[in-house]
Amino acid sequence: LIQLDEGNFGAAMLIRGSKVIGSDLRSSEITPQSAFERFQQNRRRILTGVVTTGVGAFFASRIPGFLEPETTVHAQALPAAPSKYTTSENQTPFAKATHYNNFYEFGTEKDDPAKNAHTLRTRPWTIHVTGMVKKPQTLDIDTLLKYRSIESRIYRHRCVEAWSMVIPWDGYSLSELINLCEPLPSAKYVQFFTLVDRKQMPDLPGGYDWPYTEGLRLDEAMHPLALLTFGCYGQVLPNQNGAPIRVVMPWKYGFKNAKSIVRINFTDKQPRTTWNEINSREYGFYSNVNPHVDHPRWSQAHERRIDSSTFPRTIPTQMFNGYDEVASLYSGMDLKKYY
């Protein structure tokens, strides 16, 4: 089986200088999008021969994104300035990050969202901000896109299922939107609501209390790392990755990152969240990445990193996913109890 390195596509539109703050990854080391697209075409021709063999077909069918169509390579560009939030770790290739997803509204298999999310209509799109705020808002997605400058942040992404990626997300701090709405002193939590529409989500599974909801403490949502996200890899978000607007909390497990948001509500009580309500023993409200607190059914001490390697590597999981700057948010808390 031929191993093909897809490189670090996506960052070329995001990193302009010779070196970004806090990183040893130079722009000269990043594959330009045009080169990536040529590579994908060549890869297809090579793989056409490779996977006709029994061994090639067997392995290729089991590697995330290996033979998936690059349906979003030509998506609308989203210019983003470089930021200090980056990493020298190898990025997950675009094809893998967009074809190995959890988005149950479009199916429960990892490749279902990429197959089914084309039915999602992202224009027009409105976000309602409600609850304990001085200035409730009804905001159009394009208004939000222009509200602040978009920046690129290359974050580690850790799923509760013990796999991980490194993804360049594009957006601005969630605190910018929160400050616009001016929460009341009594507001302590933020709740996010994902779109639910059976016409756009014909594969919406039963057995769940839709819409999908997630929540954060207000101080968590205000942390500079919390990202209101509109794109990835220098493009608008693909539908399967939570278009047109989602949040990214890099120190938490991935299910805390609400996708396709239509409402944000401020409250004084810990809000209902979907997975915590389904099984609070397995999915805590906080769900911070913690290698010392196992999921009841598997260890969280290690993770399978999905990157440009043919097969995922197993690496140790870091506390808070390596984002130690959030530790002060949980000072004095028993993180085995408040998981």
Predicted features along the sequence, with ranges:
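Generic hydrophobic/packing signal
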Residues: 6, 42, 50-51, 98, ...
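Structured, non-membrane catalytic/scaffold regions adjacent to prosthetic-group chemistry
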Residues: 76-339
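N-terminal secretory signal peptides
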Residues: 1-41, 66-70
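N-terminal secretory signal peptides and thylakoid transit peptides that target proteins
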Residues: 33-55, 247
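Iron-sulfur (Fe-S) cluster-binding modules
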Residues: 17-18, 29, 48, 54, ...
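C-terminal segment of classical bacterial N-terminal signal peptides
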Residues: 60-65
